[in-house]
Amino acid sequence: MKTGQRCIVIDAGHGGVDAGTSSADGTAEKDINLAIALNLYDFLNICGIDCKLIREDDTEFYPNGEDRSRSDLYNRLDYVNSIENAVLVSIHQNHFSDSGEWGMQVWYTANVPSSKKLADNILNNTKMFIQPDNTRSNKQSDDSYYILYKASVPSVMVECGFMSNPQEVSNLESSAYRKRLACTITLGITQYLNEGEY
């Protein structure tokens, strides 16, 4: 498989004291993010793709357990920038006042044009295999998505589903469903790497 020696840096959003958003039944976004990220890490390894996890457990990201005066996001970005030939895939969940909203959506950095292709590959595979009725489109990030806005490497943020939608939360709480999501994200990544336009 052609990977161009790229390293996929997997960011499980939030962690530790930062739970992210949550569902009506109290399920924390940080836990769903980590579970999907760990599945993604396993699938990428099976495919022979170099990858790293920013966090592997329920913690904030402070390298070497120190320098807590700096924000978690600054540290994550510094870590990504320290990896040669990195491609950032950040895993998150969405939330909205309308509990009927559902489905994956992927944000991408404007700083590296090929990021849009990566985002499109991920969403298209998810629509094909899991969410055929999903009508969402991917979006270019603005400054409210700091890690994407400041990214200097190909970067996407995968909003896997809505924590405000009870049915989608039920899906996201399922280990089998999370593995299916991780599989379609993996397919999108492998297509992107094989296209070699980064």
PLM features per residue range, with description:
Residues M1-I8, G16, T21-D25, D42, ...:
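Extracellular cell-wall/glycan-interacting regions and their flexible linkers
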Residues M1-L118:
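Catalytic-core regions of hydrolytic enzymes
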Residues D18, S69, W102, N134, ...:
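Glycine-rich, flexible loop/turn motifs
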Residues E29-D31, W107-N111, N124-M128, S175-K179:
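Short, low-complexity, polar/charged sequence segments that are solvent-exposed and flexible
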Residues N75, N124, S170:
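Charged/polar, solvent-exposed surface patches and flexible loops
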Residues S114-S141:
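Active-site-adjacent substrate-binding region
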